[in-house]
UniProtKB/Swiss-Prot annotation:
It comes from Emericella nidulans (strain FGSC A4 / ATCC 38163 / CBS 112.46 / NRRL 194 / M139) (Aspergillus nidulans). The keyword Coiled coil applies. Induction: Up-regulated when grown with elevated levels of potassium chloride. Residues 648-666 have a biased composition (Low complexity). This is Iron-sulfur cluster biogenesis chaperone, mitochondrial. Residues 1-33 form a transit peptide. GO terms for biological process: cellular response to osmotic stress; chaperone cofactor-dependent protein refolding; iron-sulfur cluster assembly; protein refolding; spore germination. The lineage of its organism: Eukaryota, Fungi, Dikarya, Ascomycota, Pezizomycotina.
């Protein structure tokens, strides 16, 4: 029986073979960056947020946020599936959430790259109105209208909307993008985000940490050397990064955070409070009423936003439910102090990561010169106060919390395209990486906050006599035992010559690229047999599944275009109907009755067809609507042309008679 255990290489057979960490010094990094092959075509920057997303592009040397079709600078990261099968993304999806809560998917970024059994996922199951289900590979997926979707697929739909927004603005197809992720995302979550980009039809050139992108937006025009801290409290995640900005080099010194802490948690706290208050007053429990909870959730989010600028607000939800005594309403006054008391534990959870990030950067809080606030939750006065208390100074106000990340992504895109040449980004890996060794111990090869790209090797040996194969299990995390860390992947190295334990020399090499994606290689030094793995399916999606999702996204894209064309055709039909009816009413006494009746029949036929299409009784294509509209328009124009011609001839006849009489006068 083959043993699959590894142990550290024993000194009596060979000392540890520790290759030095490959870290690019500033000058070498500059050379590496400048010789990198430049990207052809426009590169957009996308902030794929938990609550809202944004897209930006560089226009010359100036980054610009692109407004969506509704004129907004951010788009809700919400996807819904209507009863007729239509897929809605963004504002349209959010608007119908109250009447369709089970099939409206929001905050799915919190599920990306996670297993169904994760504690965070189990908590979310109790808080969202839609179904979170377990996929066959153990990943957390979501369900809507009986169909199952991966969180990466939902993210792909949102990215597709951002792509469409950019293409409408630029008036040309867009393929290349830089997409941002929370700095504390692990490898699985990063790879799932890249999968989302692929599903959207994007070539994701780089995955950039959100705080780093915000620092790029902040420091692009700054001349002086600065040490900055980026405090990023968004809709679903919290990140803190400490950077040194020096002559165009943005070097991340440390990063920390919590991938399950954000505005959604603040909303949940407020929703629970409202439900408890209503139960106390009415005796009715709304916890299992999905439509009521969705209404309360929207009201809670609105109240939270209002209390950032007001000291008091009212939550009024009429007809929230009913019992034997009649309809029940929610009328609740909420003060800023009450809200702050409710969310104080959540704000406190950001303190420890900040202190750890400062410690890892070997800095005191007083040495940080600028504090940049990113994410919508940083607008809450209590959050700002907490940041001021931590750093002993007021945060900078020059960065838009909702837009900075997308702008930074666009800047990095311009760097990759060669349009911006004086900027270099040196990011870090947020979590330690290593393998399992004898006894379930987590042996680190790369420590957290190591500058990337990086490469490191270490030699191990067998843990049992005559062991001819080993299993390399790759983990990510900060705990001492592998059971407490995240398993990224595993592979077998076979064909090791039988020998006593501790004799074989197995070199394990970790290589992390600029996207923080991990590549692991193992080699038996005596035979040079090797095996490697790229942790490239952290989302749990196979290449076939991703390709299928790409095709689904393209299918939805085609359906969206068809629906848009059908809507435009229906609007044109309404316009032609109204114009024709108006003209018929105005000139009816001058028209041939039989011909006028034919036009009226065509009007009724088209109006009935349009009404059936709107009700869903028929699913008319744009071509069918166009054909029927053209028939009415052609018939009515022919009739009205005939009427105008006859009218013109009548007007000419008397004039000709008068002229003739005048000529016959003596």
């Amino acid at each position: 029986m083959l043993s699959s255990r590894l142990s550290r290489a024993l000194p009596r057979t060979a000392p540890f073979a520790r290759a030095p960490a490959f870290r690019l010094p500033s000058t070498a990094a500059r050379r590496w960056n400048s010789t990198e092959e430049k990207v052809k075509g426009q590169v957009i920057g996308i902030d794929l947020g938990t609550t809202n997303s944004a897209v930006a592009v560089m226009e010359g040397k100036t980054p610009k946020i692109i407004e969506n079709a509704e004129g907004a600078r951010t788009t809700p990261s919400v996807v819904a599936f209507a009863q007729d099968g239509e897929r809605l993304v963004g504002i349209a999806a959010k608007r119908q959430a109250v009447v369709n809560p089970e099939n409206t998917l929001f905050a799915t970024k919190r599920l990306i790259g996670r297993k169904f059994t994760d504690a965070e996922v189990q908590r979310d199951i109790k808080e969202v109105p839609y179904k979170i289900v377990q996929h066959t590979n153990g990943d957390a997926w979501v369900e809507a209208r009986g169909e199952k979707y991966s969180p990466a697929q939902i993210g792909g739909f949102v990215l597709g909307k951002m792509k469409e927004t950019a293409e409408n603005y630029l008036s040309k197809p867009v393929k290349n993008a830089v997409v941002t992720v929370p700095a504390y995302f692990n490898d699985s979550q990063r790879q799932a985000t890249k999968d989302a980009g692929q599903i959207a039809g994007l070539n994701v050139l780089r995955v950039v940490n959100e705080p780093t992108a915000a620092a790029l937006a902040y420091g692009l025009e700054k001349e002086a050397d600065r040490v900055v801290a980026v405090y990023d409290l968004g809709g679903g995640t919290f990140d803190i990064s400490v950077l040194e900005i020096q002559k165009g080099v943005f070097e991340v010194k440390s990063t920390n955070g919590d991938t399950h802490l954000g505005g959604e948690d603040f909303d949940i706290s407020l929703v629970r409070h409202i439900v408890q208050q209503f139960k106390k007053e009415s005796g009715l429990d709304l916890s299992n009423d999905r439509m009521a909870i969705q209404r309360i959730r929207e009201a809670a989010e609105k109240a939270k936003i209002e209390l950032s600028s007001s000291l008091q607000t009212e939550i009024n939800l009429p007809f929230i439910t009913a019992d034997a005594s009649g309809a029940k309403h929610i009328n609740l006054k909420m003060t800023r102090a009450q809200l702050e008391s409710l969310v104080e534990p959540l704000i406190s959870r950001t303190v420890d990561p900040v202190r750890k990030a400062l410690k890892d950067a070997n800095l005191q809080s007083s040495e940080v010169q600028d504090i940049i606030l990113v994410g919508g939750m940083t607008r809450m006065p209590k959050v700002t106060e907490s940041v001021k208390s931590l750093f002993g100074r007021e945060p900078a106000k020059s960065v838009n919390p909702d837009e900075a990340v997308a702008i930074g992504a666009a800047i990095q895109g311009a760097v990759l395209a060669g349009e911006v040449t004086d900027v270099l980004l040196l990011d870090v890996t947020p979590l330690s990486l290593g393998i399992e060794t004898l006894g379930g111990v987590f042996t680190r090869l790369i420590n957290r906050n190591t500058t990337i790209p990086t490469k490191k090797s270490q030699t191990f040996s067998t843990a049992a006599d005559f062991q001819t194969a080993v299993e390399i299990k790759v983990f990510q995390g900060e705990r001492e035992l592998v059971k407490d860390n995240k398993l990224l992947g595993n592979f077998q190295l076979v064909g090791i010559p039988p020998a006593h334990r501790g004799v074989p020399q197995i070199e394990v090499t970790f290589d992390i690229d600029a996207d923080s994606i991990v590549h692991v290689h193992a080699k038996d030094k005596s035979t040079n047999k090797d095996q490697s793995i790229t942790i490239a399916s952290g989302s749990g999606l196979s290449d076939a599944e991703i390709q299928s999702m790409v095709e689904d996204a393209e299918k939805y894209g085609a359906q969206d275009k068809e629906r848009k064309a059908a809507i435009e055709a229906a609007n044109r039909a309404d316009s032609v109907l109204n114009d024709t009816e108006k003209a018929l009413k105005e000139f009816e006494d001058r028209l041939d009755k039989a011909e006028a009746e034919q036009i009226r029949e065509k009007i009724n036929t088209l109006r009935e067809f349009v009404a059936k299409n709107q009700s869903g009784e028929v699913a008319a294509t744009a071509e069918e609507l166009k054909q029927k509209t053209d028939e009415l328009q052609t018939a009515s124009l022919t009739l009205f042309d005939k009427m105008h011609k006859a009218q013109s001839e009548q007007q000419q006849q008397p004039n000709q008679g008068e002229t003739g009489q005048g000529e016959n006068k003596p």
